[in-house]
Swiss-Prot record:
Coiled coil: none annotated. This is DNA mismatch repair protein MutS. The keyword DNA damage applies. InterPro entries: DNA_mismatch_repair_MutS (IPR005748), DNA_mismatch_repair_MutS-lik_N (IPR007695), DNA_mismatch_repair_MutS/MSH (IPR017261), DNA_mismatch_repair_MutS_C (IPR000432), DNA_mismatch_repair_MutS_clamp (IPR007861), DNA_mismatch_repair_MutS_core (IPR007696), DNA_mismatch_repair_MutS_N (IPR016151), DNA_mismatch_repair_MutS_sf (IPR036187). CDD domains: ABC_MutS1 (cd03284). GO terms for molecular function: ATP binding; ATP-dependent DNA damage sensor activity; damaged DNA binding; mismatched DNA binding. GO terms for biological process: mismatch repair. Keywords: ATP-binding, DNA damage, DNA repair, DNA-binding, Nucleotide-binding. ATP binds at G625, P626, N627, M628, A629, G630, K631, S632. GO terms for cellular component: cytosol.
Amino acid sequence: MSAKGVSEKEHSPMMRQYLDVKDRYPDYLLLFRVGDFYETFFDDAREVAAALNIVLTRRSNEIPMAGFPHHASEGYIAKLVKKGYKVAVCDQVEDPAVAKGIVRREITDIITPGVTYSDSILDDRHNNYLCAIVFLRVGRQTVCGAAFIDVTTGEFRIAGLLPEDASVFLRSLHPAELLVSAADRERSETLRHALPAGTAFTVLDEWLFREEQAGEILARQFRTHSLKGFGIHDNPAGQVAAGVILHYLEETRQSSLQYITRITPLQSGDYMTLDLQTKRNLEIISSMQDGSINGSLLQVIDRTRNPMGARLLRQWLQRPLLRAADITMRLDAVDELKKMKPFRESVCCDLGQISDLERALARIATLRAIPREVRQLGSALAVIPLLKQSFQDTVSKRLCSIADALMPLPDLVAMIESAVDPEAGASMRDGGYIRKGYHQELDDLRQTASTAKERLLEIQQEERERTAIGSLKVQFNRVFGYYIEISKANRDKVPPYYEKKQTLVNAERFTIPALKEYEEKILNAEERSLVLEQQLFQALCCRIAGHAEVIQENAALIAEIDCLAAYAVCADEYGYCKPLIAEHTGLRILNGRHPVLERILPADEPYIANDALFDDRQKMLMITGPNMAGKSSYLRQTGLIVLLAQAGCFVPAEQAEIGVVDRIFTRVGASDNLASGESTFLVEMNEAADILNNATAKSLLLLDEIGRGTSTYDGLAIAWSMCEYIHRQIGARTLFATHYHELAELEGLLPGVVNYNASVLESGDRVIFLRKIVRGASDNSYGIEVARMSGMPSAVITRAKAILAGMEKRDIATPSSSGLSLQSMQISLFDEIDTRLRTAIEVIDIDRMTPLDALVELKKLQGLVRTGNII
């Protein structure tokens, strides 16, 4: 049942109030506070009940209803938002006891996947991006721009895109929520299908996507008349996207945005683009096995000490640098930290004491922080002078720059320390979090309440003596205030001037004029104290937010120090070397190792290191050899070493010289994309086409088993043709692993193609995979041996060996390579059958055949193909 299914006259006043609010927030799940519960109604109730697995009930007029206790709301809301829902919270904003008529309710918070500050929803080591993509008509062409923000850190970026690259950008960014225009339905649907699982998709009105609207809101946010100083003036579509984001934040009641102090262009020339396939195939951030961090490059490299560094490290690994000078500057800083172990350990200790400045600032600026968070921010800021002093004596260019750029805020630290009690807890309800001596009026109110409470103890003693009731007590609760409690056993001793307030099973409660007088003094002082304390705390938060730009700059520098130190720890503990970075298109890795596999091997099993050499004479390494011999690991290893080097990290190798790579493309493994109706082979061909269309001479191509998803002939032809195209048209450094041994012929036909193989050691009827990549081609795939190792029944293995021996004896399914050339590949299989088939077809008299005769003849030909005999 929807809200429209019931006449408005049938609704209660509260339900009419609910419907009025729901009309203003139709796209949100509305959580409506009713007493101690948040309730949902109509279709919202069905959604909530299903999403949270809670009971769906009904009100008196059959209205569906589902709810949960308000004290447990954070966990329930987190579950809803993680499932992609947008939630509006409608609270009671007046005391039901004093309300005249229906209790007044208002929207107090809006939470969406891209706009949340909740620790129950966020991962402190992962950014939470809200993104907008805009397609804008400029003259005769359509331009595309994107903007994305993490409201929990204040990071706000803008990017210019080619329209056809928007989907790739989204898959790479992996935002929590995407904003698009209702006017561009076709492109919006394309983007929806490109979104990673779990990303919320929000369609907004067309009028929000106007340049004038965006310009006004950006100028207002950054208090400027021109955006030229931000370097984004030449990206109109990106500006519109940024304006849409800011409007959406205002719409979702994010009114305190002063901590968002800058917007930064994401320059494509600064960073390497890693598409989703490359991230997945190289397992940079998550493993292919279960999607978790376990088994990924990030798990090995992340030795950061605080959340800011952890988030930045994820960005570094997903955005390797493209300029040799920038890479070398980062490597030099890592080198210095690696060599200075005692200094590095001291720095890491300091980093461990620094809380998440970025997210704390966002919560403080939006008045969502609790006193303990403010105190932690002050403690973190107090470490900055120590870090600045520590780095004064460093020599590498980047570390010196960091030392100069760190900006201590001693006055702000002193203010926080003087204002917030170090014992402040998580709750603000009972006050007491502002320190004594910070504000005179607050101290006076507290003193008044304290003095009055002391007088209550005196009243208690006086009444005990006056009534001779030794158990008489003066107590307090939130419902009845202060009262005198007397047990039933002493009921006959109660004086007549005692005014009864409440009767219990075993006691009665009273008040007297003196108690009323001091109760009023205490409650009045405490109420005023709580209000004043809250005002002082909010004022302190606003003062802190006024330093947002400096705090964010310090946070960025601390995160960078954390990442550099983490790199240095990896280099020191894992035995990594400092790569030499150059602008040429060569690549020289000596005794390289896979950074993840070497960490998970048993301690007594050494990792087999391998070289990777590219120069003018070696542009394409054709790698043959059996499955399980290490070909795929070798490809991934090479890609990860290049990626680490350009991310500014030392690499797992004895020596490495990296000619800067502009893109790393991978085609390693494939599976069906059932959602898009794509087969394994089509997925493979789509990925291969993307590589051929976008790779350059400065790219690194990692191609594994191209063509295996189709017939032998088709697959070999495609693989051969791709090799030729890469050699002639692209000239990229290429590792080409294949089970088509015929491709080894290319070494003699295409200059720069060089054969390598994954070596094995044969011992009787067994083989040992050595995991060593050596010069030369392989002539055996050892497929039966791999099948034996997998645990296949011995009868199957024995029969397979017999079949293979027979096929090799008759030269069946073994292509001849002598006819392969650049002009044609004339591979002849089943020569005898082909000849007989051709003869049988030639003698058929088609003109005299009836349809039935044709079917009979076709059956005979089919028998020849299947069995080698005419049926």
